[in-house]
Every structure is written in structure tokens, then in C-alpha cells.
């Protein structure tokens, strides 16, 4: 408990859904909504109508595009695995560099939405993701 209201918190994820290799689709926003409903925590869904002046009556659940111009005291950024370009292969380097930089810019945009607290959750580490390696190195310098 850090003295935050629910409206001070955003849970952000790259995309609302992800298609798995086995063909199934995970609806990440639905999973978050269900988890918060189960423990009676109020939330709002980030959309085009959400502005910095809007009254936030609960935790904001949003993909990264809808919080672009907003600020929260606390941001939880999860499911970085949904970003496609975790590493750059030497063979596919030309087109992957632009995509990699685009994903890095998305991460930068999200982490700058937090004014006091930032939590990043991921199953990746510095060895499995260049994006995570860059984040860890920037924190440690």
C-alpha cells in the first residue's frame, strides 16, 4: 500500500490479444478484467475517450496506444513478450532494425507514463531479449 487511489494506477500491455503458435488467441485484457472482478477492484478500460482530464474511477486497463498522452502515479507494464522483435537476427537485420527500434520506442513511451512507480513484468531476461537487456542496462547505469 503506497497511498495510491485506484485511479492513480494503470496496467498496460502491448496489445489486447495475442495469437499463439498453436493457433489459439489469448485476450489479455479479458484475463485482467476477470482477475480484478474476482477481487472486486474497480477498473476502467483505456480507449480514445480517455483523457488526462477524465475522472478515473478505477485502475486503467489499456494497451499502449490509448495511454500515449496520459500520466499515472503507478504503471504496471506487462506482457512485453507480445512485442515481436525481442532480438535482431544477423540474416534478417535490415527490416528488423526498424521494427526493433519501433518496439523500443513503445516501451519508452509506456515507462514514461509513470510519475512515481513503475513495475515491468516479463518472463524474458537479458539473455533472451535485447529489449530487456537495454532496459536493465539503462537502469544500472
Model-predicted regions and their roles:
Residues 1-119, 124-141:
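Core RecA-like ATPase module of SF1/SF2 helicases and allied nucleic-acid translocases
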Amino acid at each position: 500500500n503506497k497511498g495510491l487511489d485506484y485511479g492513480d494506477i494503470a496496467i498496460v500491455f502491448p496489445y489486447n490479444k495475442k495469437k499463439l503458435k498453436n493457433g489459439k488467441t489469448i485476450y489479455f485484457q479479458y484475463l485482467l478484467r476477470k482477475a480484478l472482478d474476482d477481487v472486486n477492484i474497480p477498473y476502467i478500460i483505456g480507449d480514445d475517450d480517455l483523457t488526462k482530464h477524465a475522472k478515473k474511477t478505477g485502475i486503467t486497463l489499456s494497451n499502449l496506444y490509448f495511454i500515449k498522452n496520459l500520466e499515472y502515479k503507478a504503471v504496471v507494464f506487462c506482457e512485453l513478450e507480445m512485442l515481436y522483435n525481442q532480438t535482431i537476427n544477423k540474416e534478417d537485420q535490415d527490416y528488423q532494425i526498424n521494427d526493433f527500434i519501433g518496439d523500443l520506442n513503445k516501451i519508452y513511451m509506456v515507462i514514461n507514463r509513470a510519475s512515481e512507480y513503475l513495475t515491468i513484468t516479463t518472463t524474458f531476461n537479458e539473455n533472451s531479449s535485447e529489449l530487456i537487456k537495454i532496459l536493465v542496462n539503462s537502469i544500472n547505469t
